[in-house]
Regions:
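Active-site phosphate/pyrophosphate- and oxyanion-stabilizing loops and adjacent acidic/basic residues
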Residues: 61, 150-151
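Glycine-rich beta-to-alpha transition loops that act as phosphate-gripper elements at the mouths
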Residues: 25-27, 53, 75-81, 97-101, ...
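Glycine-enriched alpha-helix->loop->beta-strand junction motifs that scaffold or abut catalytic
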Residues: 40-45, 67-70, 89-95, 110-116, ...
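Glycine-rich phosphate-binding active-site loops on the catalytic face of alpha/beta enzymes
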Residues: 94-107, 138-146, 172, 178-201
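Glycine/Thr-rich beta-alpha phosphate-binding loop at enzyme active sites
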Residues: 45-49, 88-90, 110-111, 121-149, ...
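Aromatic/hydrophobic pocket-lining residues that form π-stacking "cages" and hydrophobic walls in ligand
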Residues: 35, 104, 108, 124
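Conserved N-terminal beta1-alpha1 strand-loop-helix module at the mouth
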Residues: 1-91, 110, 158, 169-170, ...
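Catalytic cores of alpha/beta
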Residues: 80-90, 123-131, 167-183
Length: 221
């Protein structure tokens, strides 16, 4: 496909506006399209397809084709340069990684796409900033919690963090209140079991419920 990705600043704006990245993992391309459409109907219009899935590239292609400009579609679990290249060739608008890989960031930059590296420590944040990262994934978030994120923003007050891993309706508002710009949500909004059972209405309901749980809580900008 190799479609031109949405400009990085626009992707960042869409993520901040939506306050949530819905993570699709364990779906066939057909399931991903139906789930993605339902999630978008529920208000979750920033989607990520995990490269752990063997047909992730096809899922990204299909989502871009079917959902059009109404959604931003990225690739997740991007840990290698080859994975980054395959995802961008499939049409990914952004790369969401669990860790910090200079080659992944460089590959995204060369293609005009946004790379969101994963960080956990101040040293990793410093390295990511030096590489030009404008948005970072705090992973894994659950073992550390919102208080850790808030402490991380002390020396980095302009840092844009997206906590991911164990984030659901019970703790997402706290992360935003602590200073996150958005959160990454997996099975709490995109459970592959629902697709296997053909219950796609649950995706729309879960997305709407998740966003409703955030209330008026705004992430940092």
């Amino acid at each position: 496909m190799s479609a031109r990705p949405v400009a990085p600043e626009e992707v960042i704006e869409r993520i901040i506006e939506t306050r949530m990245i819905a993570i699709l993992r364990g779906f066939t391309p057909e399931e991903a399209v139906r789930a993605g459409r339902a999630l978008a109907d529920g208000g979750a219009r920033v989607l990520e397809v995990s490269l752990v899935d063997p047909r992730a590239s096809r899922s990204i292609e299909r989502l871009r084709e079917e959902l059009g400009a109404g959604c931003v579609v990225g690739a997740g679990t991007v840990i290698t340069e080859s994975g980054a290249e395959a995802a961008l060739e499939a049409g990914a608008d952004f790369l969401f990684s669990p860790g910090l890989n200079q080659r992944v960031i460089a590959t995204a930059e060369a293609r005009g796409a946004l790379a969101i590296p994963g960080v956990l420590t101040a040293s990793e944040v410093t390295s990511a900033l030096a590489l030009g990262a404008r948005l970072m994934k705090l992973f894994p978030a659950e073992p550390l919690g919102p208080a850790y994120l808030k402490q991380m923003l002390g020396p980095f007050p302009d840092l844009r963090l997206v906590p991911t891993g164990g984030v659901g309706t019970g703790n997402a508002p706290a992360y935003l209140s602590a200073g996150a710009v958005a959160v990454g949500a997996g099975t709490s909004v995109a459970n592959p079991a629902w697709a296997h059972e053909g219950r796609y209405e649950l995706f729309e309901q879960a997305a709407a419920d998740f966003l409703r749980s955030l209330g008026d809580t705004k992430g940092a900008t």
